[in-house]
């Protein structure tokens, strides 16, 4: 059946742990991971709950293909009500932690309440225990993992933890595993910190052996891996260059948000690109990139391992940052770089290391810095207030802000609120490039119309991974659509959103969708699970998950007015590139999107839609 069939319920207030049987009826309807975890959350949590209160819950959930031999089967999702947005938060991570939990015999962990003191959860197959984490509180993600592996005398234990950002309530704090893989968005780490939960250490030795039809599963996964290997993106581009290969591509078409979205092209893009990562540095003749790295069971291996110049001003006399470590991804390179006009690759790598070490989302952090730099250049913020000179392009300011925010010091406390709260506090809310309070990723909605609609309607706030229309609008996958045209984009966005929900819930990585469709996922799930997951059924399940998340947000107080974009994208035309003179056509697309979804004009699923999806 592929599901382990068991979940852990941890009451942090009482300090108790109990085992429950997985709800198999829900598993049939929502698969696992994002979908199934969200079903538990929306059933058990009041949508109007304070995200940082003991009444909120936080869930770690794997999918039925997590821990199996399916390519990219290392994913898990952290689900909660997010403090950055007040909406449902489903944040996905790779690495090895998810597979380890599944191999220990667990599908999911539900945490409720709040511990009176710092604790961590230790899982060794069926042995589960809450343990004191007083000695870990205040430690970085890296130190926490080091100490736990040493004290448990097990170098193979996998750790999912928070750093100082989560402890200090940074509203976009991340949950980090394997040192630099993260459930990074929406502030799931802040919820973890609010519960005095420092880490989950897992050791699993059982394996995942309950495959419905092992021979059929082996056959279909082999066939699907072959498709990945032969695809230009998953078999060549991502392994060789990683996601950062998009930097020059997106810049050339005029879709790279620059200086807090004032511009759509960055003159320094080439300096922070994937090509720059493999070019020897002038300072020491060494390349930034050391090698690529794969998550559990992944045949793509898009991860980057890089090494900084030891003489760069950010790491002089800081040997802890000199070794090979988790490298830049495209989104982080953009948010720390182009979004702020910074083209110092070493400074970007340093800020990214701090995001990993302290446990915070580099997208929201970098985009918030962009808003701060604009407020500084406007004269709204001064050096005396923020501690440094912070014009656009300042690598020194970027590094200083990363240190302040991660440690919860000085003006870093305000940067930790996110751009929506910060810009509102200083009288310029329109300068927050966010949706529902969550900062934009690395694509401009004026130059790529579909992604703008995807941002506006995302259930967790601005997000590219909830409906990655870039595949179609830029890369031509599975079909090429014109990025500056709005016709057909509502239907395109819906299709991507629903398919992504199904992939996220399976336990596989969304990057497989560069080569696969839902029709490729279906036979893998059918061979693994004791259910008939046809292509049509998976598409319907994806749509069901999307609408379930939407209804939680509606009940939390979100309405159609929250499906919007910043004023800048709706009224300030792009200055250069293919979209020169254009703004987002969201007002034209949104009503058509609602119609395609089967929602009323207020963005609520109709009775007919609810009945069709069995909500």
Residue ranges of model-derived segments:
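Intrinsically disordered, low-complexity segments enriched in small residues
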Residues: 1-92, 96-615
């Amino acid at each position: 059946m592929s599901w382990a069939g068991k979940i852990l319920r941890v009451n942090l207030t009482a300090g108790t742990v109990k085992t429950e049987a997985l709800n198999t009826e829900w598993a049939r309807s929502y698969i696992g991971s994002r979908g199934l975890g969200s079903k538990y959350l929306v059933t058990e949590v009041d949508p109007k709950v304070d995200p940082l209160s003991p009444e909120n819950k936080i869930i770690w959930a794997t999918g039925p293909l997590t821990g199996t031999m399916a390519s990219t089967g290392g994913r898990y999702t952290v689900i909660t009500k997010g403090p950055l947005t007040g909406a449902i938060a489903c944040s996905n991570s790779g690495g090895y932690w998810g597979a380890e939990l599944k191999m220990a015999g667990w599908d999911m962990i539900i945490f409720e309440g709040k511990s009176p003191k710092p604790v961590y959860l230790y899982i060794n197959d069926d042995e589960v225990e809450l343990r004191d984490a007083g000695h870990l509180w205040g430690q970085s993600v890296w130190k926490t993992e080091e100490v736990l592996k040493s004290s448990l005398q097990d170098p193979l234990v996998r750790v999912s933890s928070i750093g100082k950002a989560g402890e200090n309530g940074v509203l976009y704090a991340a949950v980090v595993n394997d040192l630099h893989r993260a459930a990074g968005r929406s502030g799931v780490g802040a919820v973890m910190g609010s519960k005095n939960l420092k880490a989950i250490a897992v050791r699993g030795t059982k394996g995942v052996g309950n495959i419905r039809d092992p021979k059929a599963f082996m056959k279909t996964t082999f066939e699907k891996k072959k498709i990945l290997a032969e695809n230009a993106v998953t078999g060549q581009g991502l392994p060789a260059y990683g996601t950062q290969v998009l930097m020059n591509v997106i810049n050339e078409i005029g879709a790279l948000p620059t200086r807090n979205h004032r511009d759509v092209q960055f003159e320094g893009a080439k300096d922070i690109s994937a090509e720059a990562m493999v070019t020897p540095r002038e300072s020491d003749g060494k390349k930034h990139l050391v090698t690529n790295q794969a998550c559990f069971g992944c045949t793509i291996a898009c991860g980057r391992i890089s090494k900084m110049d030891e003489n760069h001003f950010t790491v002089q006399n800081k040997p802890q940052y000199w070794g090979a470590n988790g490298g830049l991804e495209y989104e982080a390179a953009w948010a720390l770089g182009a979004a702020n006009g910074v083209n110092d690759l070493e400074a970007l790598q340093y800020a990214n290391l701090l995001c990993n070490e302290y446990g915070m989302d580099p997208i929201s952090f970098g985009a918030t810095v962009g808003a701060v730099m604009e407020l500084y250049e406007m004269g709204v913020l001064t050096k005396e207030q923020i501690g440094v000179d912070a014009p656009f392009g300042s690598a020194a300011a970027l590094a200083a802000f990363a240190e302040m925010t991660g440690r919860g010091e000085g003006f870093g406390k305000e940067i930790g609120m996110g751009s929506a709260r910060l810009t509102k506090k200083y009288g310029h809310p329109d300068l927050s490039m966010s949706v529902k309070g969550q900062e934009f990723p690395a694509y401009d909605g004026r130059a790529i119309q579909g992604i703008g609609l995807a941002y506006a309607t995302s259930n967790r706030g601005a997000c590219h991974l909830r409906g990655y229309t870039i595949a179609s609008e830029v890369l031509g996958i599975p079909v090429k659509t014109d990025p500056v045209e709005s016709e057909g984009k509502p239907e395109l966005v819906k299709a991507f959103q629903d398919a992504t929900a199904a992939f996220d819930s399976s336990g596989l990585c969304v990057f497989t969708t560069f080569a696969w469709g839902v029709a490729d996922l279906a036979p893998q799930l059918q061979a693994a699970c004791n259910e008939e997951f046809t292509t049509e059924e998976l598409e319907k399940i994806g749509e069901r998950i999307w609408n379930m998340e939407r209804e939680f947000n509606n009940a939390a107080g979100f309405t159609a007015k929250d499906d919007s974009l910043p004023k800048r994208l709706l009224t300030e035309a792009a200055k250069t590139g293919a979209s020169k003179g254009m703004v987002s056509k969201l007002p034209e697309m949104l009503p058509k999107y609602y119609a395609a979804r089967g929602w009323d004009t207020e963005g609520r699923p109709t009775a007919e839609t609810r009945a069709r999806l069995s909500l």
